[in-house]
Amino acid sequence: RKDLETSLRTLETDYIDIYQFHNPAFCPKPGGEDGLYDAALEAKKQGKIRHISITNHRLAVAQEAIDSGLYASLQFPFSYLAGEQELALVEGCRTHGMGFIAMKGMAGGLLRDGLTAAAWMAVQENVVPIWGVQRESELDQFLQCIREGAELTDERRATIERDRRELCGEFCRGCGFCM
């Protein structure tokens, strides 16, 4: 509650559209000992937040959040290096009427071609990316996408396949979660 009030005051607003539990080790639920979900639900009833959402880096917690039906959206690491499990999360969100917010769309800086990443992300149904920019060149590429668009061409598909062959598996997304 205190964090929410601080956010409202700092943002100089009466409400927050999407209030996210950021990377909890568990899936907050009504009646939980932690009181997190109950506090968010009360704030929603008071009109201080519009949607309760969650971010996570753990597949099990993310899946539990989807299955719970309690959340408006899930924010999770997602790039064109995503495997079957991550793709299943996207589909789970879609079928449960939840939004999917992709973080780490450049795989924590591992990917270098922002135009290809943006073109791939644009064809993913029910996915909205939050682009973390680590280099000025990435910003330039994303701004180019806004101006010109980015089509998923055969050349970009080949880049994706090459990167998947070379980079997939256990790789660091640069999120610092393991620290």
Q: Which role fits each region the language model picked out?
A:
Residues 1-101, 106-109:
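Glycine/proline-rich, positively charged
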Residues 88-102, 106-179:
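Structured C-terminal cap/extension of enzyme domains
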